[in-house]
Swiss-Prot record:
Start and end residues of each stretch annotated as Ribokinase: 1-318
Species assigned in the record: Shigella boydii serotype 18 (strain CDC 3083-94 / BS512)
Enzyme class: transferase
Name of the protein in question: Bifunctional protein HldE
Involved pathway(s): Nucleotide-sugar biosynthesis; ADP-L-glycero-beta-D-manno-heptose biosynthesis; ADP-L-glycero-beta-D-manno-heptose from D-glycero-beta-D-manno-heptose 7-phosphate: step 1/4; Nucleotide-sugar biosynthesis; ADP-L-glycero-beta-D-manno-heptose biosynthesis; ADP-L-glycero-beta-D-manno-heptose from D-glycero-beta-D-manno-heptose 7-phosphate: step 3/4
Keyword Acetylation applies: yes
Length: 477
């Protein structure tokens, strides 16, 4: 799979919210304290990382986008440490200093990759005059493509409704990572990104995906939202929009070490991708990939462009270009936006041979992207008989995905890929063999959409059936 990432360097995003400093003390533990039944940690490493809204801004800047951060801090060492750390990663800070309050700081003590305790140093900023925050937002609205409001219920977003209205008047999308159960505060936002627990705290326990969709759509209507993205941990994330089918994306996480800051990564990547001119569906695709990376790291973390590109491309153990149908639709939409011609073909591809490779290479030359749709094992049995397939679906898709000519591989359960093709609507539908174009599944739908249908020849003498027969004859001999 060959992926072109968004042009993040042209994206401008402002983050407003509760900024904090995350401190980490690391060290070995080898004994219990004589003073109390607690472990003694010999601290040998100290780290300081921006957290809360500051971590969102770091995630945006790490992709190469222009990130501006506005929030409330004290006048203390923590505020200075925050400013320095953020300046080092190209985040432009414009803090409002409140001399009567400390900068929010969270100290974590860790040993052997385990967090032993967290200590919080904070006083809420409720009651602080929000006007300086409003002024900073107003000054930036003409030069940003998205506004992120990062709510940790520490007081910086006490006037969140006024902030939403400022952005709406300027036509700037507002993305909010909500806190608490009072979603009335966020009325009129472009997108809310609650996790499943936060979502269920508002709408009630959801036993099925259908309930998530039904209650999510009601929440969108009740609070005049443009969209809702529910992050669902190991079950991925679900994007809901009025008038559109729900988009459920499976998680891409391989290992989960720490979910700290994962929500910051999701909303940060969403905002940067939107501000770069991409659709919400495309933004969710990138955010889902980024979340899969960041939960594999310890502590609040960011995702680099290279890490994101590798995650989007897929890892070797998932078969490179192997995709779900929903992921494929997003990839095709992104390709079309870049003006690329999408070619699609299908088949069983049971025992891959020279004829297959030559055919796929020729098909790829006809466009910019090649999709290969593969019959599932059950579909293959119905088509070829009980002795087939020789190779199970997963192996067939992995081999196809490894070919240079192939961009994306997807499976289908039906006898023909007509439904799948109708959903993708490639620019060019290709089939190998001696078919007539009108006999090819999906041809009518492609033609109706203004696309083309073409029949290509296989190499003479190359067929899976002939290979199987030869193997059987050799065994008898």
């Amino acid at each position: 799979m060959k992926v072109t990432l968004s042009e993040f360097e042209r994206a401008g995003v402002m983050v407003v919210g509760d900024v904090m400093l995350d401190r980490y003390w690391y060290g070995p533990t080898s004994r219990i304290s004589p003073e109390a039944p607690v472990p003694v940690v010999k601290v040998n490493t100290i780290e300081e990382r921006p957290g809360g809204a500051a971590n969102v801004a770091m995630n945006i800047a790490s992709l190469g986008a222009n990130a501006r951060l506005v929030g409330l801090t004290g006048i203390d060492d923590a505020a200075r440490a925050l400013s320095k750390s953020l300046a080092d990663v190209n985040v432009k800070c414009d803090f409002v200093s409140v001399p009567t309050h400390p900068t929010i700081t969270k100290l974590r003590v860790l040993s052997r990759n385990q967090q032993l305790i967290r200590l919080d140093f904070e006083e809420g900023f409720e009651g602080v005059d929000p006007q300086p925050l409003h002024e900073r937002i107003n000054q930036a609205l003409s030069s940003i493509g998205a506004l992120v409001l990062s709510d940790y219920a520490k007081g910086a977003l006490a006037s969140v409704q006024q902030m939403i209205q400022l952005a709406r008047k300027a036509g700037v999308p507002v993305l909010i990572d909500p806190k608490g159960t009072d979603f009335e505060r966020y009325r009129g936002a472009t997108l809310l990104t609650p996790n499943l627990s936060e979502f269920e705290a508002v709408v009630g326990k959801c036993k099925t995906e259908e309930e998530i969709v039904e209650r999510g759509m009601k929440l969108i209507a009740d609070y005049e939202l443009s969209a809702l993205l529910v992050t669902r941990s190991e079950q991925g994330m679900s994007l809901l929009q009025p008038g559109k089918a729900p988009l459920h994306m499976p998680t891409q996480a391989q290992e989960v070490y720490d979910v700290t800051g994962a929500g910051d990564t999701v909303i940060g990547v969403l905002a940067a991708t939107l501000a770069a001119g991409n659709s919400l569906e495309e933004a969710c695709f990138f955010a889902n990939a980024a979340a899969g990376v960041v939960v594999g790291k310890l502590g609040t973390s960011t995702v680099s462009p290279i890490e994101l590109e590798n995650a989007v491309r897929g890892r070797a153990d998932t078969g490179f270009g192997v995709m779900t149908e929903e992921e494929l639709k997003l990839a095709v939409a992104a390709a079309r936006k870049r003006g690329e011609k999408v070619v699609m073909t299908n088949g069983v591809f049971d025992i891959l041979h020279a004829g297959h490779v030559s055919y796929l290479a020729n098909a790829r030359k006809l466009g910019d992207r090649l999709i290969v749709a593969v019959n599932s094992d059950a579909s293959t049995k119905r088509l070829k008989g009980d002795s087939r397939p020789v190779n199970p679906l997963e192996q067939r898709m992995i081999v196809l995905g490894a070919l240079e000519a192939v961009d994306w591989v997807v499976s289908f359960e039906e006898d023909t890929p007509q439904r799948l093709i109708a959903g993708i609507l490639p620019d060019l539908l290709v089939k190998g063999g001696d078919y007539k174009p009108e006999e090819i599944a999906g041809s009518k739908e492609v033609w109706a959409n203004g696309g083309e249908v073409l029949v290509l020849n296989f190499e003479d003498g190359c067929s899976t059936t002939n290979i199987i027969k030869k193997i059987q004859q050799d065994k008898k001999g």
